[in-house]
């Protein structure tokens, strides 16, 4: 990505969306070898012109975002204020799509989550249901027949023993409480120390209503730890 390409993309986005303002604009997939400074300047330019609101990145490491924001602070510029990594109960054990997918889920990403918490950067959490692993369609009692509902990327990225054991614990809690597996997975994501907003792909209207109810569900600290297997 370079400044010229970013300007072209921004103008194309405004045109295709038939709007003169984009509320949240995210850069996708970082190239750590590229110079972020001209990119940050363009984003600031479009923000000051009233064409974009908040801006940030998807699949950028927290270290890279921190570097951007430190520079922005030094130059009296507007920093990144939002990020979209993979985050949820499913730990990413392989890169689902290739090309540098960033996850902040699981035991190994404690430092990343602490950075988001300390810097008050909200997370737009993609794959918060593990590509469907925690949608309720996959059942640990019948993995042979229910695994087929997942796409190849979900199997590649999230199908592992640790996640299946976690799914089993969620199923048990769902049975106890009369909630769905997806509701518990979404509630867990929203009740972490990181301020997270789950992004979910839904094909049926009834699923929308079901998932929205997750915003009203409350899990105890013991339940949060029980299903994840690690501290927040």
Predicted region positions:
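Short, acidic/polar
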Residues: 1-17, 66-70
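Beta/alpha (TIM)-barrel catalytic core signal, keyed to glycine-rich beta->alpha loops juxtaposed to Asp/Glu
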Residues: 34-232
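Active-site groove signature of glycoside hydrolases
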Residues: 14-35
